[in-house]
Amino acid sequence: MVAIPRLRDTATVFVLSGYEYFLGFLIICSLVPVLALAASALLRPKSGRMIRLTTYESGMEPIGGAWIQFNVRYYMFALVFVIFDVETVFLYPWAVAFHQLGLLAFIEALIFIAILVVALVYAWRKRALEWS
């Protein structure tokens, strides 16, 4: 009688052996937010009083609707602030690695600052920075 070799290879049995930890991590990461939301829904204080459902702002009850129009000047200041805030975000890593970057990065940073100075002069001439 001839022995028939088994078709089962040991390498194919452990094909997913590297993914068990990842799968467990994925399951835990999916369950934690669901359990946290369920626990907060079950453990929260139950209050049926209507006074607790009203909004509270600076010690006074709000009067009127919430849809009011803001002045356009607020948006202009916010826009100029965002522009120069983004400038700071881009210039900070450059300043940290200034010695390693060399002359080309210094010239590029000067061009970037020049463009932002032109934007500041433009906003100044358009009177976007004046509150009148």
UniProtKB/Swiss-Prot annotation:
Reactions catalysed: a plastoquinone + NADH + (n+1) H(+)(in) = a plastoquinol + NAD(+) + n H(+)(out); a plastoquinone + NADPH + (n+1) H(+)(in) = a plastoquinol + NADP(+) + n H(+)(out)
Subcellular location(s) of the protein: Cellular thylakoid membrane
Transmembrane helix in keyword set: yes
Leading EC class: translocase
Complexes and interactors: NDH-1 can be composed of about 15 different subunits; different subcomplexes with different compositions have been identified which probably have different functions.
Function according to Swiss-Prot or TrEMBL: NDH-1 shuttles electrons from an unknown electron donor, via FMN and iron-sulfur (Fe-S) centers, to quinones in the respiratory and/or the photosynthetic chain. The immediate electron acceptor for the enzyme in this species is believed to be plastoquinone. Couples the redox reaction to proton translocation, and thus conserves the redox energy in a proton gradient. Cyanobacterial NDH-1 also plays a role in inorganic carbon-concentration.
PANTHER family: NADH-UBIQUINONE OXIDOREDUCTASE CHAIN 3
Protein name, as recorded: NAD(P)H-quinone oxidoreductase subunit 3
Source organism per UniProt: Thermosynechococcus vestitus (strain NIES-2133 / IAM M-273 / BP-1)
Gene from which the chain derives: ndhC
